[in-house]
Amino acid sequence: MAQNSVSLSAGDQANRMAHRSSQGDLNPSAMAWAMVSGDSFLVTRLDPNQPGPRPPARPSVRADRRRVPVGGRSRSRSRQGRFSPYPIPGVKLDLLRSVLQQRLVALGTALATRISA
């Protein structure tokens, strides 16, 4: 029985080789490894009637937009305009400061009125 060696993965051609018979049969563990590693040509038999490998899918438009800033703006600037249901910390501190200032003025006015009376 003649045996030929077939690479299990494109990255590890030097060390990992799977031996298969000329009939194209693999033992169950080799077939499982080929399926897990993504080498489908080891699992499927080559048939001249089947079409060749499909070209890679076109990358999505969304992925392209991430690489190229739209209108020359950076990503951080584009995030500033997004709506957030949560209050911005700076606005919350300003509100707290104004409320405390109003109460302090009211308390001072009440004390001044009481002292003068």
Swiss-Prot record:
Pfam families: DUF4687 (PF15747). Residues 1-30, 43-87 are annotated as: Disordered. It comes from the Eukaryota. Residues 1-12 have a biased composition (Polar residues). InterPro entries: DUF4687. Disulfide bonds: none annotated. PANTHER family: GENE 5617-RELATED, SIMILAR TO HYPOTHETICAL PROTEIN FLJ20010. This is Uncharacterized protein C11orf71 homolog. It comes from Mus musculus.
